[in-house]
A protein has these predicted regions:
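Short, solvent-exposed loop/turn segments at the edges of extracellular beta-sandwich modules
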Residues: 114-120
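Conserved beta-structured recognition patch
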Residues: 216-325
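A structural motif detector for short, solvent-exposed N-terminal "entry" segments of globular domains
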Residues: 31-45, 55, 121-176, 216-218, ...
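A short glycine/threonine-centered beta-strand motif
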Residues: 58-71, 152-162, 227
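Bacterial Sec-dependent N-terminal signal peptides
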Residues: 1-10, 14-59, 121
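Short, surface-exposed alpha-helix to beta-strand junction/turn motifs within ectodomains of secreted
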Residues: 62-86, 168-170
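Intrinsically disordered, low-complexity Pro/Gly/Ser/Thr-rich segments with frequent PxxP/GP/PP motifs
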Residues: 179-207
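Surface-exposed, short loops/turns at beta-strand junctions within beta-sandwich domains
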Residues: 99-107
């Protein structure tokens, strides 16, 4: 009888132990990723390296930075429009030397895989842009957001110094979240040059440029940002935020995407406020009453902007001094 009781107890204990193991497994599988489960049991790094930054150091040199050291024996990368002469690994960074220079305002694709020192590999495909050493000082100077066929949504940039605009990128939004953009062509400009970009379909005047998608700007609420090049880590040159100050959703911005974009500009110091009330009031703007920068002031705030009088928009020329009352 004692042997039978002991056998039953053993079976119950084994069954109970199995339930505990199964329960723990379910909890782990529901709450942890495969990588975290692997790390939990093996106590080793099983996460692939992550590309955190891309920088073009010169016409033929590209620097890739990862979140952990890379094994130099396992770097397998190619450039589709070029060829890679050599690659050099130093801790978390991989420096690539290309055989031919990257043309200004054009992208080349680098793809392939790298491996960390634990043997975890990752594959990626990225676009890299030439480094423009001669970018002029540029400001967003005038824009409209309630365009029509005759007067489409437009943005005017003004150069306040001489330089080459190749690769400079104007976003409807930010580099993290944009709905349209234009990558400017390889072109030298003088101080005082005005560049006009159409962001919606309609009359295209001689000399005007067109955005990629022609989707228009946010009529009542939105933002523009100007970056040195299209790469994610690019430095911003200028930004502007507008709103009607009456939208009730997403803290007055109308969408979470815009709210996040404005907060990003605020955090980077390119706009003085992350509140909708800190934006330029768009209520009285129209297709011909444009937003105008006041005397090229650049304080990253709504205070440097005004709305011009009806039919007083002056794209391609100095801003009108006639203001909407």
């Amino acid at each position: 009888l004692k042997q039978k009781t002991a056998l039953v107890s053993f079976v119950h204990m084994k069954y109970f132990t199995s339930i505990i193991i199964l329960t723990i497994s379910l909890i782990i599988s529901c709450n942890l990723s495969d990588e975290e489960v692997c790390h939990l049991f093996d106590q080793v790094d099983c996460r692939p390296p992550v590309l955190t930054n891309i920088e073009t150091l010169g016409a033929q040199t590209v620097l890739l930075t990862f979140n952990e050291p890379i094994d130099g024996n396992f770097v397998s990368l190619t450039c589709l429009q070029n060829s890679i002469r050599s690659s050099m690994v130093h801790n978390q960074q991989v420096t690539l030397a290309l055989n031919n220079p990257i043309a200004l305002s054009e992208a080349q694709t680098i793809e392939g895989s790298v491996r960390d020192i634990r043997g975890n590999s990752t594959y990626f495909s990225i676009k890299v842009w030439a480094k423009n050493e001669n970018i002029p000082t540029l400001l967003i100077n005038e824009f409209t957001t309630k365009g029509n066929e005759t007067h489409p949504d437009r943005v005017e940039l003004v150069a306040t110094s001489r330089g080459n605009i190749a690769g400079v990128t104007l976003y409807a939004g930010t580099k993290d979240a944009w709905t349209d953009r234009i990558i400017l062509p390889d072109r030298w400009v003088e101080r005082g040059t005005y560049l006009v970009i159409n962001f919606s379909e309609g009359t295209l005047e001689d000399g005007n440029l067109k955005s990629e998608l022609q989707t228009g700007l946010g009529s009542n609420n939105g933002c523009l940002s100007l970056a040195k090049n299209p790469q994610y880590s690019s430095t911003l040159l200028d930004a502007v935020v507008w709103g009607n100050h009456s939208t009730s959703t997403h803290e007055g911005f109308g969408s979470k995407a815009l709210k996040d974009s404005v907060n990003s500009l605020y955090q980077q110091g390119h706009w003085e406020s992350n509140s909708c009330n800190g934006s330029i009031d768009s209520t009285n703007s129209t297709a011909t009453r444009s937003f105008c920068r006041d005397s090229l002031r650049d304080t990253n705030s709504h205070a440097e902007w005004y709305i011009c009088a009806t039919k007083a928009a002056t794209f391609g020329y100095a801003n009108s001094t006639l203001r909407h009352l």
